[in-house]
Amino acid sequence: LVQAKETDMHGIRGRHIGVIFQEPMTALNPVHSIGRQIGESLMLHRGMNTREARDAAIQPLQRVRIPAPEQRVDEFPHQLSGGMRQRVVIAIALACHPELIIADEPTTALDVTVQAQILSLLKDLQAEMGSSSILITHDLGVIAQSCDSVVVMYAGRVVEKAPVRELFANPRHAYTKGLLASIPQLSSMRKTKLPTIPGQVASIADFVPGCRFCQRQGVRGQ
């Protein structure tokens, strides 16, 4: 894909790979209706005209469980709540039934209740469509709830990868251990200081050979 021509990428984006962005208000175009934004990929990849794409956009809205989709399809992003806007972003990503779904922090801007609903929806849709998914997140709770395997990255490099259960039970890398240790525990004493990872992320100009986390843990990685 890195070496693919732009003309080839036009046929891949939306059709074979769908992307769900983290901030629905900025991901959606405020001057276009919901139906037009969903229909764009249908016109590009399915050869539909504007009217056909608008009518076909109702089905993705039904799939993501938006009530009254026949009405919502002609509304604009500002008329929807944050949770509904995120469902529209998901509908756009899934309109052409892609084989791979990339979800970039899909619940960051949502409250906890809506977050749980969106994660459950994504899981159901993935099973329904038989798609694979890549979830990009900093939320370890979301990872534990939604993923089968996990890749931990630090400063642009993979530092650890493992099945989710194994990673939470037996983290190997110091950065992973630091992340897990920083999760607040209900059993902790009220005035106990929360564990933190010391230091700052190094500048790209200061990276040293080996493990990029070594400057924060005091031990050079092999």
Predicted regions and their residues:
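ABC ATPase NBD coupling module
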Residues: 1-18, 36, 44, 50, ...
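Conserved ABC ATPase "signature" region
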Residues: 52-71, 180-181
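A short, proline-enriched helix->beta-strand linker immediately N-terminal to the Walker B motif
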Residues: 95-99
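A short, surface-exposed alpha-helical micro-motif characterized by mixed small hydrophobic
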Residues: 143-145
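Short, glycine/charged-rich "phosphate-handling" switch motifs in NTP-dependent
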Residues: 149, 161
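Charged, flexible cofactor/metal-binding loops and thiol motifs
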Residues: 163-222
